[in-house]
């Protein structure tokens, strides 16, 4: 597009619809009939897919327009389909309406009055009248309610019983009432729409917002659900057959059952033959005579009377089409609203034709060109699909002809049947071929293994599809890409361009009298000599290439540049010269990934001869996240003045000094420049006159115009005798003096640097940086001053003098430090890394103490004595158990790590810097680390001291199955080194094992980085797509692209993040009062502002707040609204946020002395300046705050580790962090998050002991926690309960901890324990046994779990606490679900007595005994065991009546239990016996019992697993629960502050506390994720994201479900599932208003945010 020629028309909206068959035929240039594409000579065949009517091909001219391949636009053709085919994209909707249709009366099966109600509601929603659509339900007529079915159904049901006359009468009354109700509703709708139109709430074209869209979606879904719920037609009372589909190709009709057929016969309606659309003559009277017509006798499925009574019948698409045509004609009243999201102004009828395809569009030839690979020519894949359709069409035509011929010749029925079945198969095939062409995934019988040929849908979707690859982003001309290399000598806002690019990139510059000389020379230089030109554009737009011309020819053209061409009229454009890129041109530089706006900035060009790469200044590396190890960057050369203006004034590098993420600087000097700055500004740096002047001249370069004065100003020397010397600080002062504006006061600044005073020696004050009137008086300049750091000298200059000065200072300092370091050199040798002999001794001594650390940690975790030797068998045994359990090993890792980390920090703090051979500042290593130039204390300590503990996924090095971490260690070795503690240092080398561990840790980091990139990239894409249209309006409100209000003010106070950093630095502002006064120039603004109203009001509110803010319910009954809510801050001076006002007033109150000392500045003046500063810090209208918010969350997420592993156990609750947590909050908006938590603030008067007790009382207690050991004894022998059958028995003996211990630790009584075992544990155990047996006997399904055929019992319904168990689909599960009572034959008293006797004898037998035990120690005191066993035998023999009754009850309720006893006295043990059939395979019973112990719950508050009492943070004492149950906590107000409960479960908070609380939770949770990594993201971005997620009063995810309600179809299509959204847009006949940025990009319009948010109108001069 040539923007120099304006166009009078533009696209303002796009309507979606479906082309009818008639329209396709009208558009088509030719019908395609021939499947052959080319003839033998390779020429296109007439009627084939490359027919010349569809476009020029193979150097043949197009027969439609007569143009060649270059200019012919292409023309579409069409293929006539022999039968209507289902459109695969609309198949689901077709299927819904087919199932909802009555095949007798051809209405929807839902009663007409209900359908009318939906029609009315949908019509109201077309005009955006949501409230009125809800009120419609209130319209009733006497006893008849619109939503009641009862009247109608009652009338229908009674029809049969009443006499004919009575039935007719009641029907008449009913229909009269219903018609009256319909007309009443229609009247209401008409009035509501008319009123809304007159009030201006809607328009003739309707109103369509995201909320209306959401309501409409819900209503249509509800309508479809209602339609499909009716089995019998509400209108005629007939049963229609059900349908089923097979893929997207076939629909079958299912036969009715006898009862339904009888009902239909009684009603006596006739079903039409929808193939021929003729009424059948006879009633459905049950006779199944074959039709006389031969054709119909074999045409099964043609005649409704001859359909089979059972099974399914294939229905032809013709019949489906005819059914739906009739239904759609009769149901227009509702369908015209279902299929139009806006008022249907065209009044076209909604037809069912949309669901079918009679004609297939053939794309023009130019879009289906064959691909060439060397000599081979491959046919286009689309042609293959279209050829198949043509071939099948011809087959159907031939079969039809054959059938007609056979019918005429009266050939036998069998032969005709064969032809007919082939015809049916061909119908299915053509449907399949059409499906494959439209959507390859919907074609049946795809060849396995082969990738299917992509259809139309595949061409649109995914990253490689039309939308994302060719519309949302395109390849461009006038761009270059090369490797970048550093260049500290160019300006920070420049880019060094190599000559190879400079002679290729051109700009079309119009020739004027002002640039004629320059352009003439460019033309003479030609295309190969820089600065030259490549071509000239004449007034008529024709181009003259200079390539290949001689110098004389070029001179001749150069001399005619201002001479107009002879045949051109007077009012024309100038000639243009396509000149080479030249110095000071502006280009856009971009480094991918483009994560935030600073990844693409405008640089000025500096062409550097003899270079081959792009040259970038060091200060830009932070913004681009670039390094010079081979990174490549893209350079784009804007091609018109508009783009150049934006690149120069908005996207320029100087303006990107602050990042919008947090408002902190993103550009600054790095590495060697910082080291040089430290040395240059240190107290012992002195320079002679020659050096001083050389440095000043070298860095300022006055000939390039970098000075702000006419000549360089220098300072007098500090030392005059013996010869003049200048300090490094004076050089800095001189630089500032020459680059800051001469008409403004010098800067005043007090700040701190990174290097503490003690490093410089006693009495040093170099840690404090002091600038007074632009002179550096004290302090070292390091990273904190001119790096990318807040409140340093460069940041302060940016605030006071603006971005240009800050950028210039960075450039000049960069050159100064480069020159300085070139002269003095900076190096780092081995001496800088050495420790003194004493230092080495300290290191060795401290590391000696670490020998026992691992053993002590292991002893502590295993509860053994501190002095236990490392080879103690009990220790090793316990360690083995711990290391086999993930949670326990986590605790061991945490304890060991904390101990060894203490040693590491002890070594480092002792040896560095006290033990280093060279001391700072002579130690270059220390100088780099301390000043922030490179590295940190960690790097220094790893080189000099030790590497420390290697961590993998937050844990120590994992252990192999053998119990070793590496083969060179012993199993379960406790030495810290075996767990990955590296005592070696890089200075003296590390051992092979240590090297291996270090490599493991390094590998984890690399994998994490690779995986993280895609995760965070997708997260950012989701955010950007949802927020892309959110912008600042001219009334300071934040709105979405369609005008939906998101926030009343950006961040609540309308402040721009990049302007707020110094807003509350009042002392700095006071010090620089006069400079700021000059900057803001209040005198020029006063006449445009209201300076009284807001100030008066704010005084009133401030007074009221001071007086009443201490009152208890002050916030609930505020008298005055905040001043920002009443007065627009852009217009009224003094309209500031309450927060800012309070801070300002507090500063003025506390610092009144400062105003007395400062000359001429009083409090009133300062307050006015700060209010003006607030006004000048407002966000600009048009700012795309949505995209900035998404970038500000997306970009820092790449710095987070992907998986953060915080294991449960060490006084901390398990919590998801990092990108997984961000995805959980933002992308899935999950209602069931991985680690839900509540934070409960404890009252101050509750002691820690009470808090711990409360913790225990609400924590979940499992049976496994009170069990000391389980012993299982397995025996095989004869069963005593089942008539002597062989049985396999298991005696399970559970030994608990001491009763006092578990009641004290968990507050559990022995009665509770017994209750859990008998009511819950045994049920679960039996279920697990059945499951295990089933698993073992998969082959013999029915015979399992029969155990001993003792009692006909089953597993009873288990306790409510076991709901969480996820069983397979067993018998038990179905019993649980249906809550059925289990039936069994209860044994009588005699039988019980017999059983008891048998049990006693079996105890004494002990046949084939096999003991399993998981006891903690095997070499226990044998006597004690025997003693306990004796007491158990005695207890079993001497059961009292209560115990016997309990045992018999348990036995009677369970399948396998034959004996049960519990220690009621001391609660020390429980024993029971299980009997299974002898042929049951051996079970690992101990494992099963252990597992069930862990699943059996003694006590639990629903949804809360455990509660922990972490260490207080910031003095706040809290409890943290795993799991969320607010209601349960509300009852605990004696211990906790119920009003202060918070949770990380947004969905739970929304449900309980409402949407505002949920919004705040989202903000807090995202902020928590970032704060863990010390990343600061402004709360404004988080507020905006939270507001967008909760804007509909719900918790909407940033995924395609959350996007569904958006009004921009193009935006949804360019995101994901293009065809799904396209289908919906087409079916709803949606209108795309082109409001959203994505939609505007699709149609090539300028975006309506930023500089596109307004139009510039030129004043038309009055006609003379």
From Swiss-Prot:
Positions of Zn(2+) 2 binding: 102, 105, 233, 236
Segments for region (Bridging helix): 992-1004
Compartments where located: Nucleus, Nucleolus
Biased composition regions of type Basic and acidic residues, renumbered to the chain: 1393-1414
Residues that bear Phosphoserine: 889, 1636
Function per UniProt: DNA-dependent RNA polymerases catalyze the transcription of DNA into RNA using the four ribonucleoside triphosphates as substrates. Component of RNA polymerase I (Pol I) which synthesizes ribosomal RNA precursors. Besides, RNA polymerase I has intrinsic RNA cleavage activity. RPA190 and RPA135 both contribute to the polymerase catalytic activity and together form the Pol I active center. In addition, subunit RPA12 contributes a catalytic zinc ribbon that is required for RNA cleavage by Pol I.
Upper classification of the organism: Eukaryota, Fungi, Dikarya, Ascomycota, Saccharomycotina
Protein name: DNA-directed RNA polymerase I subunit RPA190
Keywords annotated in UniProt: DNA-directed RNA polymerase, Magnesium, Metal-binding, Nucleotidyltransferase, Nucleus, Phosphoprotein, Ribosome biogenesis, Transcription, Transferase, Zinc
Family annotation (Pfam families): RNA_pol_Rpb1_1, RNA_pol_Rpb1_2, RNA_pol_Rpb1_3, RNA_pol_Rpb1_4, RNA_pol_Rpb1_5
Record's miscellaneous remark: Present with 2840 molecules/cell in log phase SD medium.
Region (Disordered): 280-310, 1343-1423
Amino acids binding Zn(2+) 1: 62, 65, 72, 75
